[in-house]
């Protein structure tokens, strides 16, 4: 299967590209390398972690190169360039991953966030329609739901997002469905939550907890630690995406792809301190972040055969060991 990964040099994309290649598929990565990636990080390389983040993005690129996965330096905001690239390769499936994947940064710079989220999405959808792609997979977010109305929700929960990031993800879902309805483009929407794993540089919560524990001997929690997230190890998400790409029953469907069990920030912090002894500090809550909880994965289990493998404890242990090896 030939798969085009738009924004594929990012955290999720490079893991997905490597998994596709490992099983014999033909992935091609298209990325401008300007959002949460090498080019943007080089501009602010002062301090320990910005330098390490640059090294992580370089490792991503090296891994793609070592596995002979083409990395095309292409800005998906440029419709003409993107259409030429995809028309030449004619992928069977297109996966749209491009975004400014950070709630606070999205609220501070809505114009850039719109450009890299919706403009790239519309371009990719229209090129997919034009070349007759067999499947278009859109990478949405739990933030599209807005504040969860109950501790556990499924895919029928209404979309009532707060802030720029979640609103653009929800808007993207409506645009995807419009192309599905108007043009018959087979589409699949994936909603993840609280991802973590090697070579993440986008400031996700587990990344931040581990890095401040390593660097400062402290973990800082927003609020009292009772807020919950459905923490999901990156390889579980990748497994879910692969199942969705493979299964014809996933066409024109939306799936929660998570662990399926929310845990509190305090539980996460205590899990990190078990491996990295440090202090836990509590601070003010961030009102821009919606309340979340468990995202039920019954649909993905039933239709796709999805079964997450990583508990929070095992996933964090592996992630911390990766940091130790990377920094050695």
Label for each model-derived stretch:
Residues 80, 92, 104, 111, ...:
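Residues in well-ordered alpha-helical elements
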Residues 171, 175, 179, 209, ...:
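Hydrophobic alpha-helix immediately C-terminal to the catalytic Tyr-X-X-X-Lys motif of short-chain
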Residues 106, 157, 187-198, 209-232, ...:
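A conserved pocket-lining segment of Rossmann-fold NAD(P)-dependent short-chain dehydrogenase/reductase
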Residues 85-89, 127, 212, 240, ...:
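CheY-like receiver
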Residues 55-58, 173, 207, 262, ...:
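Short, surface-exposed alpha-helical segments at coil->helix boundaries
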Residues 22, 213-328:
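C-terminal substrate-binding subdomain of Rossmann-fold SDR/epimerase-dehydratase oxidoreductases
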Residues 1-191:
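N-terminal Rossmann-like NAD(P)+-binding domain of SDR-like oxidoreductases, especially those catalyzing
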Residues 99-105, 141-144, 194-200, 226, ...:
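Active-site proximal helix/loop that lines the substrate pocket
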């Amino acid at each position: 299967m030939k798969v085009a990964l738009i924004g594929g040099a990012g955290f999720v994309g490079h893991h997905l590209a490597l998994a596709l290649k490992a099983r014999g598929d033909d992935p091609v990565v298209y990325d401008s390398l300007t959002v949460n990636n090498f080019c943007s990080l080089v501009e602010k390389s002062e301090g320990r972690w910005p330098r390490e983040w640059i090294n992580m993005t370089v490792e991503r690129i090296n891994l793609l190169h070592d596995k002979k996965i083409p990395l095309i330096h292409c800005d998906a905001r440029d419709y003409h360039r993107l259409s030429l690239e995809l028309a030449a390769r004619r992928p069977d499936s297109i996966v749209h991953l491009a975004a400014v994947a950070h709630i606070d940064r999205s609220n501070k710079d809505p114009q850039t966030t719109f450009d890299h989220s919706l403009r790239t999405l519309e371009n990719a959808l229209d090129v997919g329609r034009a070349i007759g792609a067999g499947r278009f997979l859109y990478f949405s977010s739990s933030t599209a739901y807005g504040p969860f109305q109950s501790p556990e929700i499924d895919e029928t929960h209404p979309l009532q997002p707060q802030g720029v990031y979640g609103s653009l993800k929800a808007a993207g879902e409506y645009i995807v469905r419009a192309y599905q309805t108007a043009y018959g483009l087979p589409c699949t929407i994936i909603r993840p939550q609280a991802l973590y794993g090697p070579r993440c540089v986008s400031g996700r919560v587990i990344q931040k907890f581990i890095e401040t524990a390593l660097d400062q001997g402290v973990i800082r929690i927003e609020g009292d630690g009772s807020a919950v997230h459905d923490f999901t190890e990156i390889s579980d998400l990748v497994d879910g995406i692969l199942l969705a790409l493979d299964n014809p029953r996933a066409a024109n469907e939306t799936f929660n792809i998570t662990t399926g069990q929310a845990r509190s920030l305090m539980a996460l912090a205590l899990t990190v301190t078990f491996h990295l002894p440090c202090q836990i500090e509590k601070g003010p809550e961030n009102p821009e972040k919606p309340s979340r909880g468990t995202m039920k994965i019954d649909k993905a289990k039933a239709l796709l055969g999805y079964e997450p493998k990583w508990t929070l404890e095992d996933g964090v242990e592996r992630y911390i060991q990766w940091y130790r090896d990377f920094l050695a």
